[in-house]
Amino acid sequence: MHFHFGWIPVCLALAGPVWGQQPLVGTSVLEEATGDVRSAALVADIDQFATQLIKDAEGKRSAFWKLDLSSAKSYEASVEPRRARLGAILGLHELDVRVPMVGLEYLSSSVHELRLAEAAKYVVHAVRWPALEGVNGEGIYLKQRAEAVACVILLPDAGQTPEELAGLVEGKEMLGQAAHELALAGCDVVIPALINRQSDFSGNAELGLRTDLSHREWIYRQTFELGRNVGGYELHKVLALVEWMQARKVPVGVAGYGEGGRLALLAAALDKRIDATLVSGAWEELEDTWQRPLERNGFGLIKEFGEAEIASLVMPRPLIIAHGQYPALPAGGESKAGVRKNAAPANLDHPEEEAVRKGIKRARQLVGDKLAEHLRLVIAEEGDLAIFPVEAVGWLRKALQVGKLEAPSELRIRRGSLPDDRARQQRLVNELVNHARHALQVCERQRTALVWKPLAAAKTDDVRMATTAKLRKAFWEDSIGRLPDPVGPPAAQSRVLAQNEDFVTHEVMMEVWPGVSAWGYLLVPTGIKEGERRPVVVCQHGLEGLPEDVVNEDSSAKAFGAYKGFAATLARKGYVTFAPHNFYRGKDHFRVIQRKLNLVGLSLFSVIIGQHQQTLAWLKTQPFVDGEKIAFYGLSYGGKSAMRIPAVLPDYCLSICSGDFNEWVRKCATVDLPLSYVYSGEYEIWEWNLGNTFNYAEMAALIAPRPFMVERGHDDGVGLDEWVAYEYAKVFRYYNKLGLGGKSQIEYFNGPHTINGKGTVEFLRQHLGR
């Protein structure tokens, strides 16, 4: 370890019987290892823990499913709550009301003719339709010259255009086989444009910022915090079409390939008005979603749903799964000048036939033999390059009760008038950016209704504490995700690292859950008398940090610039301090854990809170610790910890947030300031629907009436003073109205992203009594 504590060798015993030199109560000997080794092992252990949670999810799903298989009607009624739950997970937000859909708008101009192409039986138009206020669908419409016998929504992969699936693009006519066949069979066919995987519009031209984020990830980063997602928006567009088609009193089908296949399956699961569904190049079990493009993240998705469960929601309507061609992600390009490379890693796999058959078998077992008759698997013949196998399209036509095909006819294309896909993509992306902007502006109303109104209505301390406890439970379980309480009692290991005339430093590890440990440094002042109990300050490092960073007093060390060795400084003032390791370290190593945990309705802080639960329980067993006076003080990601951990763990008697307090939701979701996380590489940062539930002021309300302080440097680039002041004003007003104005403070200082250690030290002295 390369840091400096002003230590003297452990063998130089100091005079007098002081607690710091005696073995820590109830601990066994901890083997020696470096901080880097301990951290890497802890991250690896938690990764295995998260992987096991994913493996265990399937076996626990039945608790959410109460199926009535006595009849098709009874079955559909029994799964109705699951439809609503799936829609919420996918981002069909209850505040987003679809605009009434009365028809398709034809797009034409002096440049682009009304008819893009025509055949003997149908004509082709560019169209637009409303989905939400300010959010439209656009695509290609193959319209029958006579009355249509059915309507089909044909969804491309995100790497394809509607024109390609309509067979209008020279050299790619084969992609139009399914659309042409359905149109020849008498179907009206609408092919929507999806948000694609290019990055042309992933940035803010007014700020001069461009990123390499796919348009899909670009929208995800703005909307996940607001309870929405790009797939949810696209489902709104599809379901708006379903509403219009269903009113025409003909069968309605949905078919899709790749990303479009995924949307087709989800749409059919959500809307019983879809009569038949074809899913091609999209079936895979959802346990691997953490490896897929970031926008597929769903908080709690696989806790309640696998691919089989989603398919079961389509029954008893026909569902055809085609296994053949699967799309691939485009290869990453070279770095471009002026373009930030901050996209999350991702891949798309081609699942093995055996895995697909296994998933289909499980879906059939879920619904029973009678309903399973409506689920069909089509394996494409070897060498079949069609994205929609001919056999699968045939089964879709049969399910829609479509008659024989007409004889093929020439499709005459007016190539000069095809829509500009790039301009259309810009419109679609900008619409969602603007919708997210509006949602960001109004989400404060939802937080007010959820948190501040109930607290204001609480007229007694008992009612207010009960209200706070209810909100705390919701925050922990629904926003962070709650794991079972740690195993107990805590069994710890420790070793003395070093000592000086003011304190002894112990390294401590303890089991939290099987395979998951908590680890940190305990600094015990040397002046503690037998029987004396001292207050504790838990000193939390930030991103990519180690416990040694907050105890290192060497002013030449890199970490000293931010932390100033504040855990050691406080120990010299007589506080017991503990520097725990939070596992946000290792770049993609810990970020992948976040992706895994999100799938089962958990987050990094689900694990971190468990580690702190166990640490608090262990600290209280030490005879020199005042268990009623354990405070929290964290910088940067440690400041994030200061907002979340004490908010759900009342055993922390106060909290100090340094270098992180913010208009947090805005920092996560806005595209209008360079400091936003949408422009950073920290792709783990977004927390599902937090914008409508708990911003930092609301988290602070969960800490109240315990003391709470903010430490803010004017030059700290994590936020703006104006944002910080706006958010903190709500906190101070709440404390002040409770008659607790002295229990909440903010200190501004001239400085950057660092511990200042002046007003905060006085705050600790005032409330901890030293």
Residue ranges, per PLM feature:
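Flexible loop/turn segments at secondary-structure boundaries
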Residues: V135, G159-E163, R197-F201, T211, ...
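Alpha/beta-hydrolase-fold catalytic nucleophile elbow
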Residues: P156, A193, A255, S280-G281, ...
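Bacterial N-terminal signal peptides
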Residues: G6-P17
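Cap/lid segment of the alpha/beta-hydrolase catalytic domain
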Residues: A148-Q246, P251, W283-E295, K529-T621, ...
